[in-house]
């Protein structure tokens, strides 16, 4: 994965092309990103006002000029737990236009966690402070898959799953100090979250 999306279009192409050349010589596939997602990732902070949807024509040109194997696009998702201030909305029209131009290129969505309400509530009920956290509804993510998205990143949901259970364990029994107890609960919640995504949202079971 190479993300040079915070650079201008030509610089993004230049950096990505170098990575693709290096990786392909060694039999490694490359995912790149075009368009800007709001939020913070790897210490790169993009304000909501600076976020930018992916242009379908640029997406086609980007893939042709870089030779990248898969492309992460921006259609309204964002990094972190606060993805929408109002109603959730994704630009499926942009996604469809990109897939029409790049039918054989796997499309990726970053920042697409559901920010599962039950896990947010568990965090907040046990000493957490993440009011107003909101993500992409599962129904939208399922629709994205139906429109041709091949990979959906949901790191925030896994962070929430782990944190929610650790907070619950400590709140219910402050004397706990054995990592196996709180990490075990966290692991099971992560497993349940992943299973739910695979079976009910991405519908990807048995397709690896």
Predicted feature locations:
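Alpha/beta enzyme core
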Residues: 2-106, 117-122, 126-134, 138, ...
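Short catalytic/ligand-gating loop segments at beta-alpha or beta-beta junctions
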Residues: 110-114
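C-terminal alpha-helical cap/extension of soluble enzyme domains
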Residues: 125, 136-208
